[in-house]
């Protein structure tokens, strides 16, 4: 197991994965700012005067973290900021799940339908992403030790993990049953 912890390719893969996840989350928020502001408001955690500034700032921080994760001198700080974001997301999700407000959109990535729901999966996913981010912050990467082949393999693996992540996110957002879909009842 120590080979995984100390393997620079694994750290690069984790860094790329978190960067892709953050960029994929940020870009739709820039493209649909009013919709994302509604998502932030729907969490009912912020005073109304903070909803708009947070909705504008959050995608910027996500995108800056995604870019900074690719820049070696900024990587550790960006990973710590990303971990902080994921912990805040986990808390916001957990509070709303605890309140029984599972019908709201998590705001992670934009969906083409309004059928998304939140649940403990989203909370645990955010905690797992925080853990991966902390791993990225903790493991030093000596890029001179990474071959071109290993780097390309890490990039391909990170892209595949990100696609699996987004696919799982979409599947979890589907209605619970065919009857829910037929009735249009997705907010149970």
UniProtKB/Swiss-Prot annotation:
Cross-referenced InterPro entries: Methylamine_util_MauE
Any one of the GO CC terms: plasma membrane
Subcellular location: Cell membrane
Gene source species: Methylobacillus flagellatus (strain ATCC 51484 / DSM 6875 / VKM B-1610 / KT)
Gene: mauE
Membrane topology type: Multi-pass membrane protein
Keywords on record: Cell membrane, Membrane, Transmembrane, Transmembrane helix
Domain of life: Bacteria
Name the UniProt record assigns to this protein: Methylamine utilization protein MauE
